[in-house]
């Protein structure tokens, strides 16, 4: 008997992503789904909030293949949604107010909860309760629970669902712009090569919690400071600080060059616990320096002294001073560990796939 092969065409899944307004996480998720071949409809609850606040993200989403933005309109919703991603923040009350309309059409729901470690534990649990109450009977369709800023060991959602962090990627400009993407992801650095910059900070001083960390270390980067860690290593220190009100960052190509020339990159938290900087540093072989309680947020298996330096109990000054005492063989060892992470963790296709798996789209 002749055995004929049968070609089964996979049905395109119907994915909708609810947000109050688009932000960097919206792009991270939509782009990861797009490169995985999925069509994504981003249902924006309050489109007027996007004017000026996330214009760049909004534009990048519109230019991303297989992604479309839909202003809140129940008439635009399909009769059935295969996968609904509910991104509760950055404005939880507004997002939840309009979540029932798509939720009652959804076969499966991925909830990205705002009840994470950015809030005190009691407030996080209260927020999770509000989310479940807002979804009502449709909450039983939640099969994936994610957090941007990590989760507590015990919380309400963890009582009945497995929990994961979403993970993060480089800033959208390094994903969306083809030239910058290739520059950021190029494996053109040698783990064994001595670098000319010991440490850098590149970014905004805002918000206040980041400014407090920077106030503790700023003088260590000053070229006339006798306490500068660079004196012990004969390497320079690079500092480029600005405010949100006057956001004058480095040219993206210069930014990549500084990371590529730096042994260490300071990654203090900003408005969220997660920032793009640790991933950007890893991609250029620069060892991230970040808070000890943020190592589990990125989905890249950070380990202190192996592929990063952790800051304990907000002791940023002591940590930066200690960088000058890290010997060159130790720096090369950590950089070699980072290089070994590339294929399965850091390369964009691998990172995007892991995000899709956590969302529930790929196995």
What are these model-predicted stretches?
Residues 5, 10-276, 291-301, 344, ...:
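Nucleotide-sugar donor-binding catalytic core of glycosyltransferases
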Residues 200-202, 282-363:
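Pol beta-like nucleotidyltransferase catalytic core
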Residues 260-261, 281-283:
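Flexible glycine/serine/alanine-rich "lid" or loop that lines and gates the nucleotide-sugar donor pocket
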